[in-house]
A protein has these predicted regions:
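Active-site-proximal helix/loop microenvironment
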Residues: 1
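Non-catalytic DNA-recognition/assembly elements of restriction-modification systems
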Residues: 4-39, 44-55, 148, 152-190, ...
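A short beta-sheet element
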Residues: 55-59, 63-145
Length: 197
């Protein structure tokens, strides 16, 4: 919708320098707090546990402590996926230092999770990656990325319209996780003949 500028109210909005009136060009770090997760030895990550561990590409295992107590947006900082934007689907999780944790800065609290996730997916973080053998995104490079921020009213309307969808996604992802665990427990027993249907 941004390319065609077909946002709610676009018919009555003036376009100034290619940007709708009331929208602003800003650096990502002026809108969001962006910090690395914490280092965690792979020896401490288990296949089951209480808190999911988020690495560069999503959940990589479990750990007995959380370092993040809210659902957040992540930006992958290491590997081929550097610059990819992800979202945690758990309120309590451990975020490794292979990702940046993104939360709204003071004054931008209205940039809630559903908006932040979709908004940052449109930012070109891959353009500022460094490293030849292993691509990476650094604190210095990520802060050079500029974005066009819609006006507060439009962001609030977006968040209001999508927050229920986000809750539904979380609910279904948890069901998928539980069903996957059940499948992984039952399938070997069915194949070995330990249980029959």
């Amino acid at each position: 919708w941004f390319v065609d500028l077909r946002f709610p109210g676009h018919e009555n909005t003036n376009i100034i320098d290619g940007v709708p009136e009331g929208w602003e060009k800003k650096s990502v770090d002026s809108i969001y707090n962006i910090k690395y997760g914490k280092n965690l030895s792979t020896k401490l990550i288990t296949e089951t546990g209480f808190y999911p561990v988020y690495g560069a590409n999503g959940v990589i295992g479990y750990y007995d402590k959380a370092n993040c107590n809210e659902q957040v947006v992540l930006i992958t900082s290491r590997g081929n996926g550097s610059g990819d934007v992800l979202m945690t689907y758990h309120k309590d999780a451990f975020i490794t230092n292979n990702s940046f944790i993104v939360t709204p800065s003071e004054g931008f609290e209205y940039c809630k999770l559903p908006f932040t996730f979709q908004f940052l997916k449109m930012a070109n973080f891959r353009a500022v990656r460094t490293g030849a053998a292993q691509p990476q995104l650094t604190n210095q490079s990520i802060h050079t990325v500029d974005v066009i921020l819609p006006n507060k009213n439009l962001i609030e309307k977006f968040c209001s319209a999508t927050i229920g969808m986000n809750d539904t996604i979380i609910k279904y992802r948890e069901q998928i996780r539980l069903l996957t665990e059940a499948r992984d427990r039952l399938l070997p027993k069915l194949m070995s003949g330990e249980i029959t249907i």
